[in-house]
């Protein structure tokens, strides 16, 4: 399980304010470094390139702006999920908490597809853990076929398949059918 340092959420500071004191100056010591506040620009760029034509170009400031927006979005959703966990006296935020938060914050149209993705992801991870425990504790490369779903690369492949099906540029509307 991946653990996140959510120190920037304390005191109500958003991502745009994180890393600066009241005067707007960068922190002296122990503050949040920029690379800890934002996702890597290369990852942002790679995702953005999937949404534009092959010959399309993306300006550096557009990438940097989206990098900040994505980080703020993560903070926004995580903060809402954290509030839910605190009310329920739990310390660990799970996938369902994040989906609940997204629905609460007005992103309802993403909740059902993400529930499906989360379920399939957990199946893949579960298969991977079972395969690892079955033998000598390691997953054999030659036993993992393209459809076995038993490796972390399968889980990573799911991300690409899922995001391609999301239709970045066009909202997905359904007439009550899921």
UniProtKB/Swiss-Prot annotation:
It is found in: Nucleus. Pfam families: CBFD_NFYB_HMF. Keywords: Activator, DNA-binding, Nucleus, Transcription, Transcription regulation. GO terms for cellular component: CCAAT-binding factor complex. One of its GO terms (molecular function) is sequence-specific DNA binding. GO terms for biological process: regulation of transcription by RNA polymerase II. Residues 66-77 are annotated as: Subunit association domain (SAD). SUPFAM superfamilies: Histone-fold. The keyword Transcription applies. Residues 131-156 are annotated as: Disordered. InterPro entries: CBFA_NFYB_domain (IPR003958), Histone-fold (IPR009072), Transc_fact_NFYB/HAP3 (IPR027113), Transcrpt_fac_NFYB/HAP3_CS (IPR003956). Residues 39-45 bind DNA. It comes from the Eukaryota. Ubiquitous. Component of the NF-Y/HAP transcription factor complex. The NF-Y complex stimulates the transcription of various genes by recognizing and binding to a CCAAT motif in promoters. May regulate the expression of photosynthetic genes, and may be involved in chloroplast and amyloplast development. Belongs to the NFYB/HAP3 subunit family. Heterotrimeric transcription factor composed of three components, NF-YA, NF-YB and NF-YC. NF-YB and NF-YC must interact and dimerize for NF-YA association and DNA binding. Interacts with NFYC4 and NFYC6. This is Nuclear transcription factor Y subunit B-2. It comes from Oryza sativa subsp. japonica (Rice).
